[in-house]
Swiss-Prot record:
Coiled coil: none
Record GO biological process: translation
Family according to the record: Belongs to the universal ribosomal protein uL11 family.
Protein's name according to its UniProt entry: Large ribosomal subunit protein uL11
Keywords for this protein: Methylation, Ribonucleoprotein, Ribosomal protein, RNA-binding, rRNA-binding
One Pfam family recorded for the sequence: Ribosomal_L11
Record function comment: Forms part of the ribosomal stalk which helps the ribosome interact with GTP-bound translation factors.
Molecular function GO terms recorded: large ribosomal subunit rRNA binding; structural constituent of ribosome
Disulfide bridge positions per record: none
Post-translational modification: One or more lysine residues are methylated.
Assembly: Part of the ribosomal stalk of the 50S ribosomal subunit. Interacts with L10 and the large rRNA to form the base of the stalk. L10 forms an elongated spine to which L12 dimers bind in a sequential fashion forming a multimeric L10(L12)X complex.
Gene (name only): rplK
CDD domains: Ribosomal_L11 (cd00349)
Organism of derivation: Methylobacterium radiotolerans (strain ATCC 27329 / DSM 1819 / JCM 2831 / NBRC 15690 / NCIMB 10815 / 0-1)
Length: 149
């Protein structure tokens, strides 16, 4: 018989930097899950990734207080900022104040868009790479990035 699911917790945790402080501790603690067990497992799985990369994670909590977690690809905005050479960190560079109208904050090529789309395909709600590129192009425009050929 399968375990009964009591809920899901969605978090964005920096790779290799999971610790029991907020937001992880309170989110898992209120479900009665072992916080340190998650932190150790997550850090072990993300050890080979670049430190600080934001990783979306979905934690499934079961009635017996056990859990499983699924990691997704980093957000599209992370890939776009990295490809455009914008500042990454705790307070990332904000995009354009008037996307599509005013000055652009950076440039990104079609090849870079395609590369990002191929990485994000499993997490996106689309069937073809072309539609994934179109979605990511829209995100780039909304951030104030200019797409060049």
């Amino acid at each position: 018989m399968a375990k009964k699911i009591t809920g899901y917790v969605k978090l964005q945790v920096p790779a290799g930097a999971a610790n029991p402080s907020p937001p992880i501790g309170p989110a898992l603690g209120q479900r009665g899950l072992n916080i340190m067990e998650f932190c150790k497992a997550f850090n072990a799985k993300t050890a080979q990734m670049e430190k600080g990369t934001p990783i979306p994670v979905i934690i499934t909590a079961y009635q017996d207080r056990s859990f499983t977690f699924e990691m997704k690809q980093p957000p599209v905005t992370f890939f776009l900022k990295k490809a455009a050479g914008l500042k990454l960190g705790k307070k990332p560079a904000s995009g354009s104040k008037t996307p599509g109208k005013g000055p652009t904050v950076g440039k990104i090529s079609e090849a870079q868009l395609r590369e990002i789309a191929e990485k994000k395909m499993p997490d996106l709600n689309c069937d073809t790479v072309e539609s994934a590129v179109a979605m990511i192009r829209g995100s780039a425009r909304a951030m104030g990035l200019e797409v060049v050929a």
